[in-house]
UniProtKB/Swiss-Prot annotation:
It comes from Synechocystis sp. (strain ATCC 27184 / PCC 6803 / Kazusa). It comes from the Bacteria. Its EC number is 2.7.7.18. SUPFAM superfamilies: Nucleotidylyl transferase. The keyword Repressor does not apply. This is Probable nicotinate-nucleotide adenylyltransferase. Belongs to the NadD family. One of its GO terms (molecular function) is ATP binding. Pathway: Cofactor biosynthesis; NAD(+) biosynthesis; deamido-NAD(+) from nicotinate D-ribonucleotide: step 1/1. The gene is nadD. Catalyzes the reversible adenylation of nicotinate mononucleotide (NaMN) to nicotinic acid adenine dinucleotide (NaAD). InterPro entries: Cyt_trans-like, NadD/NMNAT, Rossmann-like_a/b/a_fold. Pfam families: CTP_transf_like.
Length: 200
């Protein structure tokens, strides 16, 4: 059994998040997704570094996942896996599904350089496969990949040629900059308007 673990800031979730979830559903038996605080974020909230509260981000991600589940029921939210430390999330997944499954940790290309600074990274990396998605504005440096390998990591790069259409060149940060509603799913757009988020 192959299980993908996808903790995301979801600040807000975009059509790129939707595309990633669909790709994962097509390649894994189970996709576990949750909204998480990223300790490296530098947003306006001094406590979390994010733009929207964790509660709002969880609600928006739930709306996105409910939309994806119409076609891919194996994509499910597991908020109890959420932790600022990926190793803790993995350990909680192992408590839920056991040690037998092959676990993959889903990350964006923007995180590759940060991973070596993560909590207990030498324990984390040998226990999972990293599935790395391209991100607009972030190249993938072979030296950074080599460093991951030295730390015991093994990874899969989502093909940036054949799969480019699967991950559109948009991101939460691009949405926050230009406020283009075409970048986010309709249910998320309605929630943002209702809650008056991202107005600054």
């Amino acid at each position: 059994m192959k299980i993908a673990l996808f903790g995301t800031s979801a600040d807000p979730p975009t059509l790129a998040h939707r595309a990633i979830l669909i790709w994962l559903a097509q390649h894994f038996d189970q996709v576990a997704v949750w909204a998480a605080d990223n300790p490296f974020k530098q947003g306006p909230n001094p406590e979390t570094g994010h733009w929207a509260s964790l509660g709002d981000r969880q609600a928006m991600l739930k709306l996105l996942v409910e939309d994806v589940q119409k076609d891919y029921a194996t994509v499910q939210i597991w908020e109890d896996l959420s932790d600022r430390r990926s190793l803790i999330s993995l350990q909680r997944a192992q408590q839920r599904w056991g040690l037998e499954p092959d676990y993959a940790l889903v990350v964006g290309a923007d995180l590759i350089r940060q991973i070596s600074q993560w909590y207990a990274v030498k324990e984390l990396l040998p226990a999972v496969q990293l599935v790395i998605f391209p991100r607009p504005g972030y190249g993938i440096n072979q030296a950074d990949l080599d460093k991951l390998a030295q730390l015991g990591g093994h990874y899969q790069l989502v093909n940036q040629g054949d799969d480019q259409a699967i991950t559109p060149p948009i991101s939460s940060s691009i949405y926050r900059q230009i406020r283009d509603d075409d970048l986010i799913p309709d249910p998320v757009q309605s929630y943002i308007q209702q809650r008056q988020l991202y107005r600054q």
